[in-house]
Amino acid sequence: MSYLNLRLYQRNTQCLHIRKHRLAGFFVRLFVACAFAAQAPLSSAELYFNPRFLADDPQAVADLSRFENGQELPPGTYRVDIYLNNGYMATRDVTFNTGDSEQGIVPCLTRAQLASMGLNTASVAGMNLLADDACVPLTTMVQDATAHLDVGQQRLNLTIPQAFMSNRARGYIPPELWDPGINAGLLNYNFSGNSVQNRIGGNSHYAYLNLQSGLNIGAWRLRDNTTWSYNRSDRSSGSKNKWQHINTWLERDIIPLRSRLTLGDGYTQGDIFDGINFRGAQLASDDNMLPDSQRGFAPVIHGIARGTAQVTIKQNGYDIYNSTVPPGPFTINDIYAAGNSGDLQVTIKEADGSTQIFTVPYSSVPLLQREGHTRYSITAGEYRSGNAQQEKPRFFQSTLLHGLPAGWTIYGGTQLADRYRAFNFGIGKNMGALGALSVDMTQANSTLPDDSQHDGQSVRFLYNKSLNESGTNIQLVGYRYSTSGYFNFADTTYSRMNGYNIETQDGVIQVKPKFTDYYNLAYNKRGKLQLTVTQQLGRTSTLYLSGSHQTYWGTSNVDEQFQAGLNTAFEDINWTLSYSLTKNAWQKGRDQMLALNVNIPFSHWLRSDSKSQWRHASASYSMSHDLNGRMTNLAGVYGTLLEDNNLSYSVQTGYAGGGDGNSGSTGYATLNYRGGYGNANIGYSHSDDIKQLYYGVSGGVLAHANGVTLGQPLNDTVVLVKVPGAKDAKVENQTGVRTDWRGYAVLPYATEYRENRVALDTNTLADNVDLDNAVANVVPTRGAIVRAEFKARVGIKLLMTLTHNNKPLPFGAMVTSESSQSSGIVADNGQVYLSGMPLAGKVQVKWGEEENAHCVANYQLPPESQQQLLTQLSAECR
């Protein structure tokens, strides 16, 4: 085998192909370029490849004129990833035509296609005069624009100066590229069970099944959630079976409004009013449709540049924005929200080297909106609760938040029902160095189940501040104060009281009860304080504190919650010390817990280049103490096994004792497996009195036009990987996800309205499989089942030596298989590499435009060729 053909074979086994033409042209061009380098210098405008450098006989070399102008490929249609200014735009079939002597082949892109990628067509002279289906001469019509096809990456790189681009936020993906997905049905199942042997209380068995089903048709998504439970115990006669329907809803996105429509069962957002479940209809903003640079709160930067200048913005010492602006006033409104605070340092660097530096204070609370951004929700329906004592009154709710200049936000909302009316209004402010604050008040008129009417107000404060110098982040301080007459909507939904009869010494009389007789609504909420603080200690330690304190009207009882913890690391050894306290207003005493956890990876004692399986394992120790004398100590190991690390295990053993409970040994062991067809787990735990076996299986089923595909549990948005004929191919960066026997797999999650990269590990392909493309990009809408399709060539890998009139075929001739879509370029000695070939067929060869510059070769291979890594064959082309 010649060196050139060996390189061709190695290149192809790495699956670096394009759809219609092989990348062998790259090596032809490289070889010819090396030969050309030995010649005397020629004018770059008139490159000429002397075929005598390839063969003494000029007839032994095909027409290589296309390489003289830099063409790596002949004109044709190729599937490519389109990148504009280094940002991904789309993956589509693009037709490439012959350009001038300097351009080689050029892409044919229409005005509408360029406009969808952000080109401001009105800013380019003469572009709007072109026909809708005309190919835009991009590099000649747009000054300094470039178009380059990277054959090896199957990528079309476009660059267009910012002056000709529409003003779009960073990370913007045109809605035209959002993929609503395919029509398909889905089912998620999650089954778990346990068997308990209790030496004192007897044996018990429990099982639970959660079924989440759905149907996607176009942009509509239908979802349903149903559960089943089973319980049997020695303490009770018989067993209990229970099916329960949780919810059903239909939803879709409303792209022009950047909103989402929900019909059926849903829930309201809890940003202004308390979140509630409903059955009805809701139209609400979906900020996921916005680019990352437009989500969350960030200040709008205004400045003035003397000339064309570079603007750099830093936050907490990190560059978060960099752009070039024209002379004059400028506005930057697409800064990515980075945390909740941290002042922004803006630097304007002029072309002459002079700089302007100023600081824009920045803090945020959850309700703050960017300047000019509006978020809303409108809900109408009936109240929905799993509490049988609550009714289903109809209600209407609306909320609105709007960002104003100078860091201000106004917001408000209404809740209206027959027995309840509430109105909210609030303001928020980014106060810069002083933090961020929002204040709102809700006025409510309530009619309770005893028909008593109440008016009240509730005032809420939210505050956020970071002290960057000390590493302190006051993530949230919240306080809500409610008057004695304030009730929320849920309080008014309990079944009404019509009175009851009581016996007295004067006989039976009818009495109208007070609401305190049946429902515990007398102790309505009064004040609530919330606090969350994190403190950075050095580079590897973090201290956190969080807590809440709730008081009630009519009682001195309070709810209290408090958590504190210290996370630290020394080299690769991690340990955590934590404390928690919980007190319920209606229960005596309080629950406290102190815990210590230490984890040491075994790689701490292994060489960095060790191949031992123990490099994926860690030793652990944990201690917990309830501060009432009860303590548990556990030590053990945990880690992962198998090539894909999709089998995880944990074994712990120790001692529990003290307090009022029994003392003795305790421990547990668990195994969890994540596979291409689903997940499974099993575990066992024991103490002196109790032994427990628990187990579970979960997964997803996807029914689509190409059949049924099993996978791991499906999230809201998923990707169907389609590689027909390529079984057991691994999806990169996904534990346990591989194609099934037909070449299909389910990527169980994807990020909606964002570019998702789906790649196959070509090292896991069978020897008889080649891929045209190993990477696909998808941009799914919310709830979509999008298809990432890969074209696999399944068949024999063939190295053919072709002759014509007893001579090797000309160097550079194009070879195409009639029975498959495989093609290649003839190297020296008439050799060509083809993949995905059947046992018998014919190939067509072309090396020029003349009548006698093409031929056809028939071939027949023995059956054992299907088991060979590479088959060599000689054939006569006629």
Language-model segments: residues:
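Extracellular beta-sheet/turn segments enriched in Thr/Pro/Gly and aliphatic residues
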Residues: 155-159, 366-369, 774-795, 859-878
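Structural motif
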Residues: 67-70, 83-84, 173-177, 300-308, ...
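Feature captures outer-membrane beta-barrel proteins of Gram-negative bacteria and organelles
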Residues: 178-180, 205-218, 242-255, 392-406, ...
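Post-signal-peptide, soluble extracytosolic/periplasmic N-terminal scaffold domains
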Residues: 2-11, 18-19, 27-297, 626-702
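A short, solvent-exposed beta-strand micro-motif common in secreted/extracellular proteins
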Residues: 111-116, 345-348, 669, 753-765, ...
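Transmembrane beta-strand segments that form the barrel wall of outer-membrane beta-barrel proteins
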Residues: 162, 181-199, 220-232, 261-265, ...
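Exposed, low-structure sequence patches enriched in small/polar residues
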Residues: 511-517, 522-818, 823, 827-839
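A short, solvent-exposed loop/turn motif at the edges and junctions
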Residues: 118-120, 164, 761-775, 847-860
